């Protein structure tokens, strides 16, 4: 009797031990298609790691950034794996809020990751996030509509040429809009696109003494061009459209042209989700007076907050989701063209290049993007479509709201730029610039 009770107790404790050993990781990510695919394929990870369970929190881009910023700044500890970009990796890594991505397995082959991507996610040589995909920006256009109109897209178009094409191809009565661009307010939404437009017109966020330049001729020309072109030749409600909204519009055949992230290449050519999959052309992002900073550099990456109590398990998952093995899994289940792009040299095999008609332009754009030299003028900051200082998140969000207001006609462009100049100057002084 005593022996049976003892065995029963031992069995219960063993069962309890197994239950306790299973760790649940809370993964916060953005509602982009590549991440939705990662969530779906993560069942493979859980099968290989029965001691790790995944709890997914999938959010719209602006909401994700707000949630993660609040949680990590307060050391809230809600999440074990964060989907962040180069901006957060640099700043949060420097503050000691992220666990270093050291001691990765040899099979991870970190040397295979593009140096510019590694550097963008590192601080003083220490890597703080593993890149899931990396992107630049490029131009997508409807080859059939260009042919019908007798137009030819140059390999390196100017924004002025883009506006001319948009005017000729804009047929709102047929729900065919000349150009689709980001209008949704957010430092990583409309301001990513707007800043590359401004760079192309020769503008910069700050001069060498950290003084904003929004009322200067370059920003004035760029802002007027952006608001005028998108208001005249864009879809209705453009101020509500970010990356995902414009992707849906393009895939439904409603955009003659679209300038946005290179990562969209696999989606616009996917017949299962794009009505125009066989009618898409690809070329470089537009320039104007300069090509410096005309195409951005960005990476969505997986990081681990120091507040996580399950760092080892979190690193195991992050390494799996950003590995060559994961890329091979995607190629097997969804086709080689859908492999997360922009992070690894090995991705760009002959097979991938043949299957992905957008890959050549995307790869060249990634390699040419230089965050250390984003403007024709000298700048005190690093970043093409953003400024890598802690204050930029708040400033960029506020500026984005004002650009969206100008786009909806709530205020003239000059008035908007004056307001932006004043608010940005005030915030920079409050933060103690110049430093």
Describe the residue ranges of each PLM region.
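Extracytoplasmic "Venus flytrap"
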Residues: 24-41, 59-61, 135, 385-391
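Hinge/lid segment of periplasmic solute-binding proteins
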Residues: 85-136, 160-161, 178, 190-193, ...
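Short, well-ordered beta-strand elements
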Residues: 22-32, 52-57, 80-81, 128, ...
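Extracytoplasmic "Venus flytrap"/periplasmic binding protein-like
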Residues: 40-116, 120-122, 148-150, 157, ...
